[in-house]
Amino acid sequence: MLAKRIIPCLDVRDGQVVKGVQFRNHEIIGDIVPLAKRYADEGADELVFYDITASSDGRVVDKSWVARVAEVIDIPFCVAGGIRSIDDAAKILSFGADKISINSPALADPTLITRLADRFGVQCIVVGIDTWFDDATGKYHVNQYTGNENRTRVTQWETLDWVQEVQQRGAGEIALNMMNQDGVRNGYDLTQLKKVRDVCRVPLIASGGAGTMEHFLEAFRDADVDGALAASVFHKQIINIGELKAYLAGQGVEIRIC
């Protein structure tokens, strides 16, 4: 059995790490490189960096900080933000990233997933899915351009349909960003995670809602996710990664101990 992964998420805007609630009202957390090093030293299995306004601004993630991060950490990291072409991805990978993640550009051009997977291998390609539960319809819908609240829009895709579509096109991993839960720290949306797990054959990463160590345990135990991504509980030092891993190991979760 592969070890479950603990993955701090660093949302990047204007060269700094920020954090919002339900993808809104972002506050500045700190500088990118020191935070990355701190999480690596604490025992994170992987880091994810989202340049949250790159897609909505029509640009690619700033590659300069990617190289600086690669110099100071020795764990895998994934970078997302406005990647629209093989050339964009190649440059980010050449600067030291281990994976690239695409979200809004994949919705605009689903063939991008296949082209990237064919060029770099599925193990490098993560598809991020920003999913929102609509109380009125009782359905989960995929949103696009969520880094800019003035441009965010609901797409034609229901979440489960898009999960299946991206797998068919070559996604090697799926990061499910549950917008309703983002930043509120009241637990992952286990109902949605279980539904996605039923149709997801590739590694599945849960994102949005972690507030306690028990929330991580529930995601691993009840929804069988492969990794749990979180931001505010780590940024605000509510949970220490080493202590979290010790707790999970004590609960029988297969995890890499620091």
UniProtKB/Swiss-Prot annotation:
Q: Which reaction does it catalyse?
A: 5-[(5-phospho-1-deoxy-D-ribulos-1-ylimino)methylamino]-1-(5-phospho-beta-D-ribosyl)imidazole-4-carboxamide + L-glutamine = D-erythro-1-(imidazol-4-yl)glycerol 3-phosphate + 5-amino-1-(5-phospho-beta-D-ribosyl)imidazole-4-carboxamide + L-glutamate + H(+)
Q: What does the UniProt keyword field contain?
A: Amino-acid biosynthesis, Cytoplasm, Histidine biosynthesis, Lyase
A GO cellular component annotated for this chain's UniProt record is: cytoplasm
Q: Where in the cell is it found?
A: Cytoplasm
Q: In which pathway does it act?
A: Amino-acid biosynthesis; L-histidine biosynthesis; L-histidine from 5-phospho-alpha-D-ribose 1-diphosphate: step 5/9
Pfam families noted in UniProt = His_biosynth
What this protein is reported to do is described as: IGPS catalyzes the conversion of PRFAR and glutamine to IGP, AICAR and glutamate. The HisF subunit catalyzes the cyclization activity that produces IGP and AICAR from PRFAR using the ammonia provided by the HisH subunit.
Q: Which named protein is this?
A: Imidazole glycerol phosphate synthase subunit HisF
